[in-house]
């Protein structure tokens, strides 16, 4: 009897304990459900170091000398209005300095011209056709445009010279030609002048002469590494309104994949296609393989009227943005890949553990449900009462043991869970983070000091040629122009006044004479 009573009490206690712990309604199952893996967006991009052969050029000091010289010649003949030969032959003759003259000018910082001639007539007019000796030196000189023709039946010659000199520093550029790297000077109009690395380079343009001295120029070639972003370019095709990746279309594999490389070297950003020689203004980069010349950018011939910043500056800024964008895409792609990896790993672990702990999925979903797997990946969910969770493994008379809440009668088995040691299951590399960097800008060639001097000299000539002086030494016009301001006006007014008084006197004398004659006769 006692044994029966004990069994009954134990049974009631177990039933009561089971009702406290088993709080899920298995009769209200819903499903089936399947855990979904996160699908990452395919992006084949990586950050790598590329070994290249770098050719660079550095310049220092005064390495560029600009000189100009020209003469205004006006040769006239005055045969009267009926002579068809009357008139002037005017022209501006460029007389750019020779290489030896420009060297001498650069040392003395003076330019030399022939003699001026103003209103040289008769036999003196032969100076217009003489061999001029460049013996008159000036710091700078601007011409005066004379066109005198004031001597009847004689020829008249007018000569006026202009000259100038500028010694400055310019940057030479690099250009790829036939797989080789050469130095060039870029004119404001985009013309490329080959520069010798061992001897001075001299060339002329109209009345201007240029001399580049390579003494302060250093050109070197070295092997170096560039940090680049490598992106696989997969061709796509459109079929029936849908876009497909032809990399794997029809089960075929792209045996010759194409890649884009976006690289950075100090403050320069550029695209480095595979197997190509790419030239920036002061550096060229070459990879192994077949060489295809690429000027980057391919437009040095830029008019100074179209751009306040050169096209290279704009391209450099654009490629710096591309470089940083590629870095950001790489970082986001890495994060996306990590999320996908974590998603798959988490789902596998969750499926495995949820088959042991039927409350695991409910905890992850934030719902009070229990799970029951009916296949390796599909499961049913049943609603449950909420289970408290705190900073201890015990709650009231229950203890969490082996993945279940069970009855606990030994308080010594309880302990605090407020502190725990972290365990890193993943080995991720450090993310590359984009940052703001200085971008090197060069400006247009026309804004460089030497070329601005050329532009100013040409503008000064235009201003001078706008005005013509028809007068000279020994002419009546020179006498008139030599009077002070207001003198002619005063003389004219005095002439008019004196003329009026004279007429009054004459008329008075005539009247007096008439009266006297009447009395006599």
From Swiss-Prot:
Attaches the virus to host cellular receptor and later induces fusion of virion with host membrane. GO terms for cellular component: membrane; viral envelope; virion membrane. It is found in: Virion membrane. Keywords: Disulfide bond, Glycoprotein, Membrane, Signal, Transmembrane, Transmembrane helix, Virion. Pfam families: Baculo_gp64 (PF03273). Homooligomer; disulfide-linked (possibly homodimer). The chain crosses the membrane at residues 501-517. This is Envelope glycoprotein. InterPro entries: Baculovirus_Gp64 (IPR004955). The keyword Mitochondrion does not apply. It comes from the Viruses. One of its GO terms (biological process) is symbiont-mediated perturbation of host process. The lineage of its organism: Viruses, Riboviria, Orthornavirae, Negarnaviricota, Polyploviricotina. Disulfide bonds: none annotated. Gene3D superfamilies: 6.10.250.2130, 6.10.250.3010, 6.20.460.10. It comes from Dhori virus (strain Indian/1313/61). Residues 1-20 form the signal peptide. Glycans are attached at residues 44, 158, 189, 396.
């Amino acid at each position: 009897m006692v044994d029966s009573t004990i069994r009954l009490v134990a049974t009631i206690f177990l039933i009561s304990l089971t009702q406290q712990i088993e709080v899920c309604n298995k009769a209200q199952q819903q499903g089936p459900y399947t855990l979904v893996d996160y699908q990452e967006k395919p992006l084949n991009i990586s950050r790598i170091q590329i070994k290249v052969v770098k050719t660079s050029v550095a310049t220092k000091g005064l390495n560029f000398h600009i000189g100009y010289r020209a003469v205004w010649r006006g040769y006239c003949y005055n045969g009267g209005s009926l002579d068809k030969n009357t008139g002037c032959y005017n022209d501006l003759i460029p007389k750019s300095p020779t290489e030896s003259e420009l060297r001498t000018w650069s040392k003395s910082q003076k330019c030399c011209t022939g003699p001026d001639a103003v209103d040289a007539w008769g036999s003196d007019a032969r100076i217009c056709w003489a061999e001029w000796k460049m013996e008159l030196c000036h710091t700078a000189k601007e011409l005066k445009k004379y066109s005198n023709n004031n001597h009847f039946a004689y020829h008249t010659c007018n000569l006026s010279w202009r000259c100038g000199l500028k010694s400055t520093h310019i940057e030479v550029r690099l250009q790829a030609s036939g797989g080789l790297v050469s130095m060039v000077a870029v004119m404001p109009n985009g013309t490329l002048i080959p520069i010798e690395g061992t001897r001075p380079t001299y060339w002329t343009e109209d009345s201007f002469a240029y001399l580049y001295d390579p003494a302060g120029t250093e050109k070197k070639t070295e092997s170096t590494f560039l940090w680049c972003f490598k992106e696989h370019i997969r061709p796509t095709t459109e079929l029936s309104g849908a876009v497909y990746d032809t990399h794997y279309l029809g089960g075929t594999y792209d045996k010759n994949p194409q890649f884009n490389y976006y690289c950075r070297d100090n403050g320069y950003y550029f695209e480095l296609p595979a197997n190509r020689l790419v030239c920036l203004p002061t550096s060229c980069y070459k990879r192994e393989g077949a060489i295809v010349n690429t000027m980057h950018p391919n437009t040095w011939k830029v008019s100074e009227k179209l751009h306040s910043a050169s096209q290279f500056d704009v391209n450099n800024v654009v490629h710096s943005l591309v470089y940083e964008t590629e870095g950001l895409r790489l970082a986001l792609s890495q994060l996306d890949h990590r999320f996908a990896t974590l998603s798959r790993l988490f789902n596998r672990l969750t499926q495995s553990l949820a088959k042991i702990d039927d409350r695991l999925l409910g905890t992850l979903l934030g719902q009070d449900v229990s799970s029951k797997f009916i296949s390796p990946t599909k499961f049913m969910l049943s609603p449950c009462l909420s289970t408290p969770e705190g900073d201890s493994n015990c709650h009231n008379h229950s203890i969490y043991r082996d993945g279940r809440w069970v009855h606990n009668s030994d308080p010594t088995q309880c302990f605090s869970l407020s502190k725990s040691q972290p365990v890193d299951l993943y080995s991720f590399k450090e993310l590359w983070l984009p940052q703001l960097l200085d971008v090197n800008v060069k400006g247009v060639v026309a804004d460089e000091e030497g070329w601005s001097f050329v532009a100013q000299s040409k503008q000064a000539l235009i201003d001078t040629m706008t005005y013509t002086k028809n007068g000279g030494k020994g002419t009546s016009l020179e006498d008139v122009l030599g009077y002070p301001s207001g003198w002619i006006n005063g003389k004219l007014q005095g002439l008019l006044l004196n003329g009026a008084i004279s007429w009054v006197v004459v008329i008075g004398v005539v009247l007096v004479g008439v009266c006297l004659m009447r009395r006599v006769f």
